[in-house]
Curated annotation (Swiss-Prot):
Gene name in the database record: rpmF
The organism's place on the tree of life at top rank: Bacteria
Similarity section: Belongs to the bacterial ribosomal protein bL32 family.
Segments passing through the bilayer: none
Pfam families assigned to the protein according to its UniProt record, in alphabetical order: Ribosomal_L32p
Source organism (scientific name): Levilactobacillus brevis (strain ATCC 367 / BCRC 12310 / CIP 105137 / JCM 1170 / LMG 11437 / NCIMB 947 / NCTC 947) (Lactobacillus brevis)
An annotated Gene Ontology molecular function: structural constituent of ribosome
One GO CC annotation: large ribosomal subunit
HAMAP family linked: Ribosomal_bL32
Protein name: Large ribosomal subunit protein bL32
Alphabetized UniProt keyword annotations: Ribonucleoprotein, Ribosomal protein
GO biological process, one term: translation
Length: 62
């Protein structure tokens, strides 16, 4: 069975794992209510998407 010839150093290990991280959210203000929401997703606070009401929200501010 294959085994590593040498111990992997902390630096080498951290360099390899450098790309493993959480992606940042693309937040944009909702044009209808102004709250931050994810891009290309229905606004959870008002239910609008692309300028029209898509989802009925119970506690709409407008």
């Amino acid at each position: 069975m294959a085994v590593p010839a040498r111990k992997t150093s902390k630096t080498k290990k951290r360099m390899r794992r450098g790309h493993i991280k959480l992606a940042t959210l693309n937040l944009a203000p909702c044009p209808n209510c102004g709250e931050l929401r994810k891009s290309h997703v229905v606004c959870p606070s008002c239910g609008f998407y692309d300028g029209r009401q898509v989802v009925a929200v119970k506690n709409a501010n407008n």
